[in-house]
Amino acid sequence: MNPKRCAACKYLRRRCPKDCVFSPYFPPNDPQKFACVHRIYGAGNVSKMLQQLPDQTRAEAVESLCFEAKCRVDDPVYGCVGIIHLLKTQIQKTQNELAKTQAEIAVAQTKLSQTHISDFM
């Protein structure tokens, strides 16, 4: 048993075994992280997911699960898809603004070059 139980084992009110699948990813000083993931996915499902993954990808998977769970708690209808949609909309607006600015630059350069040509004649 670990001297300090991980956030998952504290939340689940159980002993934290030496081979606890949660302890590397849910430290005792961040209980909200596990609570959010547990609320959305359930401890059993998260445990199964982590055990099916190679050790080197588990940390990234936990970060993704935490982000997605927090998004789902904050926005129960859309979750992280709402954020993705918002970001895509911002990208599209920025691309449109960039295209407009590039067109204005092209017009200004054309006028400038025509001014220089007429100055030489």
Curated annotation (Swiss-Prot):
InterPro entries: LOB. It comes from the Eukaryota. It comes from Arabidopsis thaliana. This is LOB domain-containing protein 23. Belongs to the LOB domain-containing protein family. The lineage of its organism: Eukaryota, Viridiplantae, Streptophyta, Embryophyta, Tracheophyta. It holds the Pfam family LOB. Coiled coil: none annotated. Residues 4-105 form the LOB domain.
